[in-house]
């Protein structure tokens, strides 16, 4: 269902005629991503891993997700150079459909009966927020997600607007980056490339030091870095 929500959001977005319509449809896409993205994958890996290896396992899985960021941004820009943005949305929606065809082939793990696991969402959320530890983690990951979304949405546009035209004789042009929008996509890809090594290293550190302090340091350094870049 979540994947269908993701696909539907992408397809319907091709008919959007205003920024407000795009923002509304982004909510639908967001619901789809919430049920199919890295958050769900990390939860599964976290439960399946032992306490000793959990931190490193999560780091490796996150690094694999960064490979998608490294490849996805330049691929999207390449497709935008060939097709209209509506067609690119359809292409990505079709790629999600292809992944969905593989899901029935995966072996399901036996779960508890529906009666045993059926709990209202209101009760689950209420119990979670009664725990101060969850509230602190929630605020931390809210800041993390906000920063990631902000960088992903605005950093390529900032690079596109602030950089001058790329010279045909430049090294960038030689490697196929001929426009400032292409340079913006490359910038996001470089962030993903760096994140591959950063998340694996963070996973290793998580096996050696308290994770809450590591998270605090990572978030603080990211905030300072983004602030310095803005200035």
Residues of each region from the PLM?
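Cytoplasmic membrane-interface "Motif A"-like loop-to-helix N-cap segments
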Residues: 1-3, 208-219
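Paired small-residue
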Residues: 9, 20-28
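Helix-loop-helix hairpin linking two adjacent transmembrane segments in secondary transporters
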Residues: 61, 65-105
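Extracytoplasmic gate region of multi-pass secondary transporters
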Residues: 133-189
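Helix-to-loop junctions at the C-terminal end of transmembrane segments
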Residues: 199-210
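Conserved small/polar residues in nucleotide/adenosyl-binding loops
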Residues: 229-230
């Amino acid at each position: 269902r979540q994947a269908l929500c993701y696909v539907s959001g992408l397809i319907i977005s091709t008919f959007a005629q205003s920024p407000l319509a795009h923002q509304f449809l982004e909510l639908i896409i967001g619901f789809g991503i919430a049920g199919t993205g890295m958050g769900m994958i990390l939860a599964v890996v976290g439960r399946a891993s032992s306490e000793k290896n959990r931190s490193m396992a999560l780091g490796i899985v996150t690094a694999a997700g960064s490979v998608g960021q490294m490849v996805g941004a330049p691929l999207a820009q390449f497709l935008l150079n060939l097709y209209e943005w509506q067609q690119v949305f359809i292409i990505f929606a079709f790629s999600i459909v292809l992944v969905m065809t593989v899901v029935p082939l995966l072996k399901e793990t036996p779960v508890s009966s529906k009666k045993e696991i059926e709990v209202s969402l209101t009760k689950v959320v209420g119990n979670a927020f009664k725990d101060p530890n969850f509230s602190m983690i929630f605020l931390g990951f809210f800041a993390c997600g906000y920063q990631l979304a902000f960088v992903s949405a605005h950093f390529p546009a900032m690079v596109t607007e602030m950089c001058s035209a790329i010279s045909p004789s430049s090294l960038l042009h030689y490697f196929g980056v001929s426009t400032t929008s292409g340079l913006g996509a490359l910038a996001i890809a470089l962030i993903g490339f760096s994140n591959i090594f950063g998340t694996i290293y963070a996973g290793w550190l998580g096996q050696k030091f308290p994770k809450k302090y590591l998270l605090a340091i990572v978030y603080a350094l990211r905030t300072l870095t983004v602030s310095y870049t803005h200035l």
